[in-house]
Amino acid sequence: MQHGRITRGFYFEDLPLGTTWLSQGRTLTESDLGTYVNLTWFTEDLFTDQHNRTGNAIGGRPVPALMVMAFSEGLVLHSMDRTGLAFLNVDMDVKSPIYVGDTIYVHCEVIESRATSKPGRGLVRTRNTVTNQHGETVLVYQPLRLYKSREGKTDATSTS
C-alpha cells in the first residue's frame, strides 16, 4: 500500500508490511542550525565556528545528524497525528554529511507491524530514509512506535 501526502494519523491497521509514504520537504537553514546548537548546547566547533572549523575537509556548513533526525521526525509527525502513543526505540545510520541549505525528504516504509497483547494498540517499525534535494541518502533510521488501533480492536494480520 502506498500513501501520498498524509492528512491524518495512521491507525495500526493502516500500516501493514510494505506500506510507504513520503514527507514534504524541509530546507535546513543557518537559523535552524543556530537555534538547535544553542538549544541543545551542541557547541562543537564544527557547528559553531564557521571560519575556524578544525579538520573540516568536507566543505559547506555541516548540520548535526541528530538535528536532521529531529527535523525528519517533524516531517513524519502527521502520520501519527492523534494515533501515535509512544516512541519506543530507534536505530540510526548516518550515510552522508548534511549541510545548511540542503532540503530533506523522508521516505517511510513499514518493515514490522504486529499487534500487542493489550487490545487497542499495535507496534510498527518503519525504515525512514532521509534524502537530500539531489536524491542522495543522508540518513536512515528505524523507529519503533506504538499506535492506536481503530475502536480498540487488535488485528494481528501483519507480521514482521
Labelled PLM ranges:
Residues 45-47, 86-87, 92-93, 123-124, ...:
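Short, intrinsically disordered/low-complexity patches at protein termini
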Residues 1-89, 150-160:
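Hot-dog-fold acyl-thioester-processing enzymes
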Residues 81-100, 106:
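Mid-chain, well-packed structural core segment of small domains
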Residues 1-17, 98-160:
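HotDog/MaoC-like acyl-thioester-processing domains
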